[in-house]
Amino acid sequence: MLSLHQEMLLLAVNDDGDIEFTAGTSTFRLAFVGACLIELALKDKIEVDPEEVRVISRDVDNDATLNLVMKRLCEHSTPQRLGFWLSHLQADVQEITRLTLMSLCDQGILKSEESRFLWVLSSRKYPVIDGTEQKEAKLRIMETLLGDSIPSTEDSVLIGLARAGGLLEAFLSKKEIVRLEDRLEQVSNLELTAGLVELAIQEEQEAIARAMLVSSHPF
């Protein structure tokens, strides 16, 4: 199984290897960092509640991206609020992205070619890992949104993060997103930690908007 942050990044890579424009936005960067934090929570490395993020295991992971995030978390001797980490880790987003892209290349899903990251397989399925074949994230999201089944925890979280990070616009029109709004509400972030992350992302977005407004209209 691929991790949440790997699948988040794959949602931003289109069929010709270019990166979707939405990946350059602050909303995507917040959601991408949020995916790393949720993945750590699912691996029982951290605990997230409305007040703070606590490290509960410092064991080294086999994922270089998560190890970098854990290193940053452990640099603070006292627990910090979720919003703090979403903002603080923005300084590492470029390196977090690079490490995640490299991990996808190492797994034979992407290949680097002239500043682009091309899909190795055209079947929209990931290479077989541990004997299991997994459909690509966009296909799973579309099947969930257009169907009536309850998604897995991972897919529910991924849909919520894609929504918060503006990635749905990469493969759905605005009209389709509006039409699917009720279904999105039904299937997004059924997992508690993911719901807290999405709320914190919204709060950070509002803070960024307020700061931009104040800076453009100084008193």
Regions found by a protein language model. Name each.
Residues 111-112, 133:
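A structural motif
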Residues 45, 109-110:
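Short aromatic/hydrophobic-glycine micro-motifs
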